Amino acid sequence: YVSLSPDSVFNIITDDISHQILSRSNCERSKRPKRVFSIYWNVPTFMCHQYGMNFDEVTDFNIKHNSKDNFRGETISIYYDPGKFPALMPLKNGNYEERNGGVPQRGNITIHLQQFNEDLDKMTPDKNFGGIGVIDFERWKPIFRQNWGNTEIHKKYSIELVRKEHPKWSESMIEAEATKKFEKYARYFMEETLKLAKKTRKRAKWGYYGFPYCYNVTPNNPGPDCDAKATIENDRLSWMYNNQEILFPSVYVRHEQKPEERVYLVQGRIKEAVRISNNLEHSPSVLAYWWYVYQDKMDIYLSETDVEKTFQEIVTNGGDGIIIWGSSSDVNSLSKCKRLREYLLNTLGPFAVNVTETVNGRSSLNF
């Protein structure tokens, strides 16, 4: 491991805070089965092989990873927009193209599931795959109200379909009907996708990336607590969480945020995922998706303080582990590969090994 001197920046956490982490995390996790706190590597560092560089050292820091730096492998695999979920696909001219009906209420489930099965066979041919399976689908949200920004087109399209069918209805009646239809079939597509994944790769542990959503640290909701409506809506998604072995809240932070806002963001999202897990009979694990760069400044790695604080919030609020994610654009040149490897060896790795050993009771925290 990297040698840490007493005056190192990693000593900023005292024994008192170490005790606080252990006592608080035990309290938060007490309602659920005690699990080994694990950190996973979900970065396409196989791309660095072309520069004669590998990342075998992740193992030295108690970080679980796929063999040969594979992005999808025996330990963890993420599937981006798999199958043929109904969606309105943006075109370069600003228009949209319907994929499989455009919105879930017009989609063909058979076409989607056949394609999903083919994608799974292509990307993970091993039927005995026993790792973590992450379905990353972000074209729309299964809660109608939550489709804003890039996904709002699906809400508008759904409303227009009902308006054409019932031109004399009031706007409130139209929106209510659009909501009902959209959410019914959104559930159908997402639920059947999970069921098929679990049926064909029985040994794997499955879940959807990003859920539960929280919508905290926003202009309208600046604090750590999740949006009140979102919390109620998360309870309505029990059909999804009941089919997941793992919850994957996303805790990517931004450079423009104040230091305390980054803490709030992680705190609220982990608490919400743990709350949901506690309310489910099978108590799914909570693994936070964590990115080592700032979401709005992707050329800047998280400071040591931000690594420390975000890891600390994941642990103390009851998370069961961390998935370190990275984009292909993070490792698409020799200089970027060198930078990431140096960051792993000098910053990220030491934090990872100290957190895992502390939470799992093998040492006292020594940042």
UniProtKB/Swiss-Prot annotation:
Keywords: Allergen, Disulfide bond, Glycoprotein, Glycosidase, Hydrolase, Signal, Zymogen. Glycans are attached at residues 108, 354. It catalyses: Random hydrolysis of (1->4)-linkages between N-acetyl-beta-D-glucosamine and D-glucuronate residues in hyaluronate. GO terms for molecular function: hyalurononglucosaminidase activity. Its EC number is 3.2.1.35. Disulfide bonds join 48-337, 214-226. One of its GO terms (biological process) is hyaluronan catabolic process. It comes from the Eukaryota. Belongs to the glycosyl hydrolase 56 family. May play a role in reproduction. This is Hyaluronidase. It comes from Polistes annularis.
